[in-house]
Amino acid sequence: MSDQFDAKAFLKTVTSQPGVYRMYDAGGTVIYVGKAKDLKKRLSSYFRSNLASRKTEALVAQIQQIDVTVTHTETEALLLEHNYIKLYQPRYNVLLRDDKSYPFIFLSGDTHPRLAMHRGAKHAKGEYFGPFPNGYAVRETLALLQKIFPIRQCENSVYRNRSRPCLQYQIGRCLGPCVAGLVSEEEYAQQVEYVRLFLSGKDDQVLTQLIARMEKASQNLEFEEAARIRDQIQAVRRVTEKQFVSNTGDDLDVIGVAFDAGMACVHVLFIRQGKVLGSRSYFPKVPGGTELGEVVETFVGQFYLQGSQMRTLPGEILLDFNLSDKTLLADSLTELAGRRINVQTKPRGDRARYLKLARTNAATALTSKLSQQSTVHQRLSALATVLKLPEVKRMECFDISHTMGEQTVASCVVFDANGPLRSEYRRYNITGITPGDDYAAMNQVLRRRYGKAIEESKIPDVILIDGGKGQLAQAKAVFAELDVPWDKNRPLLLGVAKGADRKAGLETLFFEPEGEGFSLPSDSPALHVIQHIRDESHDHAIGGHRKKRAKVKNTSTLETIEGVGPKRRQMLLKYMGGLQGLRNASVEEIAKVPGISQGLAEKIFWSLKH
């Protein structure tokens, strides 16, 4: 504990009410957030002579200040604790690293409803189905729904400005409600109802209604209509046969946990209306010395109680671990949801099978993750040996991408001891250089990246320069001129020249621009990690360049038209669903866009045609 922190004096001021406490280090950084039913009793436990663990000892040794927030109830304290954890990301708390809100399928409340993927706050009028484990699961479901129930998925701006049906109508993936006369209001409403039932898990009702309609069409000698409905029935049956369905139609989240070698995996299985929508594995950041019970309690609290997560709470949560605060968690979730939420730890029947499945998935995912990390550690250790460094904890790699010198983008990719650190990948738009001058581009990106203060932990041990001797010379020149408060001599600059025909395994490495290069055997683990980060950097640069090029392509044609400024360009692209939609639009359709007169619409039409 810091000499400046007087624990005895502080504890005299602490109340015995419930609340939340925040611990700070000498730098004023929050290092731990906790909650307590009795603040005085809980905080006193930190300053006993016999502390529970080394983790607690390390924490207490750094305390410089403690702030306390008193709450009315334990539930308030629990909610506030997890909001503070999200805000401060304290070093000694278990942290849920995935902060994305879950995607839903959104069925809008329009006259002709549309289907779309949705994340975030649910402000738009309509119905939300989910949550789904990831965006891929939503897109896959939307593609399936489009084949079975062809209701529109286009944006309202596109829908409102169409005078003729799009390609989706031509291939039978949309009923074309945008054009009068293509589909009756009754038929469209019926298909929307099928979608609603299907997404609610009521497949049997969908099939019953479809079979009745098919039989009626057949009796009326409407054989084409009967055949179309028959195909719908078969499609629905094919989908439902593939799903693992429980005997009950409950909404459940099932949470399995695995813990090994200081790493935890929490696997969440999402079940809605008795069907498994999907699952996701999480690897929370676990401080050393943390016990499994704390990992599970903190994860579950953060997973459901951090307000911005926008999670939809199921009626029941199944856990394979007993929580000391299970009742408090259930009460907090109940208060949050406005309905009773049960937390179960010893289920039977189907629920026990689900829990076993989640536990198995957690163990499998953790084994895979540890194996990947072991491989990365071996490769970095081999690289450190080759480069004669004590260790390689952090690497950064740079690459340049452009087309004939235009839209130049530089990428910076970061690897740490566990591999790619994608949250720290960066792209830089390069400007003010001679088109096609890769040396100037490399010079600029390195100055922008390193010509400023850098945290000690973020100084790379190795900087890879993709491009060989010339690019390495630029890097050496930049670092020689840097005037920065950190140790600019710490990073080892390494040039990587592509092999003949750009074949993997034939790379040449350079320590000095004028020196002789050297190669590593094709089966060298050190070479493999160099190839990995180099390929990541290359892909990241190309991805940024393509986005930039596409943006220029979408706006450059419109920029040449007199009277079409940035706001009108944006409005045109928004209402027409992009440049291609605008190219296909008639003068009358263009004139319907706000701010576009008939005369300007004609000018835009003819400019795009010629």
From Swiss-Prot:
Keyword DNA damage listed: yes
Any idea where the UVR domain is? 204-239
Q: Name one Pfam family in it.
A: GIY-YIG
| Annotated compartments | Cytoplasm
Answer yes or no on keyword rRNA processing.
Answer: no
Spell out the InterPro entries in the cross-references: GIY-YIG_endonuc (IPR000305), GIY-YIG_endonuc_sf (IPR035901), GIY-YIG_UvrC_Cho (IPR047296), Hlx-hairpin-Hlx_DNA-bd_motif (IPR003583), RuvA_2-like (IPR010994), UVR_dom (IPR001943), UVR_dom_sf (IPR036876), UvrABC_protein_C (IPR050066)
Assembly notes: Interacts with UvrB in an incision complex.
Provide the family line: Belongs to the UvrC family.
What this protein is reported to do is described as: The UvrABC repair system catalyzes the recognition and processing of DNA lesions. UvrC both incises the 5' and 3' sides of the lesion. The N-terminal half is responsible for the 3' incision and the C-terminal half is responsible for the 5' incision.
Protein name as it appears in the record: UvrABC system protein C
What gene does this protein come from? uvrC
